[in-house]
Amino acid sequence: MFDISSILIRGGGVLIVVILLLWIVEHNEDFIDAKSMNYNNQTV
């Protein structure tokens, strides 16, 4: 039982980290898109 629970905890931690990384990447892409749009608007 202890081995199974520890594996589940590790798997859950990995899942949380992966979800956080994906969310951060998507958030950064939105931020970069907004930044580049503002930059293009300023140059034009």
Curated annotation (Swiss-Prot):
Q: Which domain of life is it from?
A: Viruses
Which locations, inside or outside the cell, does it occupy?
A: Membrane
Q: Which UniProt keywords apply?
A: Early protein, Membrane, Transmembrane, Transmembrane helix
**Carries keyword Transmembrane?**
yes
Q: Does the keyword Transmembrane helix apply?
A: yes
Q: Could you list the residue ranges that cross the membrane?
A: 4-24
- List cellular component terms (GO): membrane
Membrane topology is: Single-pass membrane protein
Q: What induces its synthesis?
A: Expressed in the early phase of the viral replicative cycle.
Return the protein name: Uncharacterized membrane protein pNG4
